[in-house]
Amino acid sequence: MAAYQIQSLVGAFKEHYDKDSFMKNLLLDNLLLIDIYEREKQLHIQANAPRVVMLVETQYGRSRDRDRDALVILQGMIGPGSGDFVTQVDENSVVIIHAAESDHADEAVARYADGVLNYLQEEGIQDARVAYGTVVGELKEISHSYKEARMALDVSRIFFEEKDVI
């Protein structure tokens, strides 16, 4: 009985690790289209659901410990049961793949980004910034939303330095 439970835990860990690497490769546009369809079926991910990428970055004090804290805090905020996914693509930023309500949910996405920023501030991370891309309808387009969020964050450093949600 104990061996079966341990085996189940190992399987769940491997599935999460596979999902994490799949999402990272998807964000960075490192997958072929056929691989995307194959892996989404294996990992039980819905392909045609509206999603948006949010990029959370600590503006000052970009130590790894600080960003790791943000990752853990955001994973705790979102939880495993929601349709959202949290990962870290580089050492300075945390990525949230948020399951949007519809393709035209700009106000809801902005409110969610404000909520993420407020939650981080309540948890003691005061220098965070949140940028988000457009809502995309398919999983294969998620890298476009990520690139838009990344560009919004880069441009905001120059033109909108006072804004925390971009």
Per-region residue spans from a language model:
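Hydrophobic, helix-rich cores of sensory/ligand-binding and other regulatory modules
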Residues: 1-166
